C-alpha cells in the first residue's frame, strides 16, 4: 500500500490500480493526495511499484549542459525557446507532444498536441501543479497505436510516466523534466485570480507568467474582459500575490520541500530550464531576455537535442555553472515558516485573507527599483558594497 504522506499528486497509482481502490482527494489548500480504500485494496503492490515518490530511475549525471537561444522562437517560450524548436520538429516527424497549458477556465492541465497551434500554449511557464487526470489513458492509447511521444513535465510527473510506460514502450517514449523549484496549487492560484478580478471589475480570460512585455526576469500579463471590452494588463511579479509568494517559496505543495528529484541526476532524457546567471560567464547572453538551459541525460536525449541544434545558438558549459544559480539542480527549497502561517490564515479567515497575506508589503518601493535604469542599479549596488 502506498505511503500517502509522501504523495506528490501525480495520480499514477489511480491509473494503475486494477481494483479501483485509490481515490484522489484534495485538502483545504488544494493539495491532492492518493487515498486508499482498504475495503477494495488487496495489497497487490502495483501502486508501490510505479510511485515516483518511492521509485526514481535516474540517468547518469552529464558533465556539460548547453545554453541555447532559438533563432526564431525565443519569444514563444519563457526562456530561450528551445522547447518549441524540439517539440515542433517532433510533431513535424509525426510524433505527439504532451505538456501543461491553461484551459478556458484557467485550470492547468496536461494536454496533447499534434499541431503547431496546439503546441504554442505548452511553451510558457506555469507555476502551479498541472492536473494529470485522463492523461495516462491518452498516453497509453497513443503508445499502443505506435506513435512516438514527447512528454514534458515536472520531475515527479516525468518519473510517473517513465515508471508506467518506459519498460513496454521504451523506444517510443521521450521524456523531458524541467528544473522545478516546486509547484503551487490550483486552488491558491484561483483565489488570487478571483481577487484580481474583483479589484479590476472584470473577468480574466488568460494569464501568462514570465511575459516578455518588460525587461525583467519575472513579469506577468493577462487579458481581462470588462463591459464587453478586452484589455491586456501587465505587471511585475511582486504586483500579483501568487507570483510574489511563489518566488518566496511559500506556497508550494508540501512534498516539494523534500523532493527526491532536486539533484544533478535527472529522470528525463533531457532536462530543460532557465540558464540563470549565464551573463556572468558570457556577457552576450542576457538571462532577462530568456536563455534556455538544456542537459542531455541519455541517448534519446541526444536525439531530441539534435532536432533543434540547427535552429538555435548553442554554447556549452560545465554542469556546475548551471547548478550555481539553479537550486533545484542541488537540493529542494527549505520548508518556510510562512507557509504554515498562510495555511492557518486560509483555514481561519478564508481565501480573501489568504491573498492579502500573500501580497508584497512594499509594492511602491519595488516598483521604484524595477523601473530604475540598469546603470543606476549597478552604481547603487557598487556603492552599497563599499559602505
What positions do the PLM features span?
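Immediate flanking context of iron-sulfur cluster ligation sites
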Residues: 1-5, 35-42, 146-149, 238-254
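Iron-sulfur cluster-binding cysteine motifs and their immediate structural context
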Residues: 1-6, 12-35, 45-63, 265, ...
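Short, charged low-complexity linear segments at domain edges
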Residues: 12-34, 126, 222-241
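Flanking helices and flexible, charged tails adjoining ferredoxin-like Fe-S electron-transfer domains
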Residues: 39-145, 320-334, 338, 344-357
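Gly/Ser/Thr-rich loops at beta-strand to alpha-helix junctions
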Residues: 78-81, 104, 151-161, 182-184
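Long, compositionally biased charged/polar accessory segments in the mid-to-C-terminal portions
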Residues: 93-96, 197, 202-387
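Short, surface-exposed basic-aromatic patches at helix termini and helix-loop junctions that form
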Residues: 162-173, 193-198
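Short, flexible loop segments at boundaries between secondary-structure elements
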Residues: 173-195
